């Protein structure tokens, strides 16, 4: 089993537990160059999203693949979710380790007002 398959298996296991709770989830996906975040409701509809691909986020950054970029994305996604009335979420790290960019995004979202 390769690295990606292991990560996806971890992600599926975590998502099933979150689905049982029936709450909104903050989903994170990262690549070496970019990081993406979405708030998804229990009906699988995207409520809010932000990523380093977006022009509004990219303009504020020097590089899109580092911890500072993840913090910016976390702040943007939290602000957009709160505008839509979502204040509480479950954190879905998509099988990635809670470290580095993933942890930075989560911390920034918490500081911006999301609760998880």
UniProtKB/Swiss-Prot annotation:
Transmembrane segments: none annotated. One of its GO terms (biological process) is translation. NCBIfam families: L18_bact. InterPro entries: Ribosomal_uL18_bac-type, Ribosomal_uL18_bac/euk. Belongs to the universal ribosomal protein uL18 family. Keywords: Ribonucleoprotein, Ribosomal protein, RNA-binding, rRNA-binding. This is one of the proteins that bind and probably mediate the attachment of the 5S RNA into the large ribosomal subunit, where it forms part of the central protuberance. The keyword Ribonucleoprotein applies. GO terms for cellular component: cytosolic large ribosomal subunit. This is Large ribosomal subunit protein uL18.
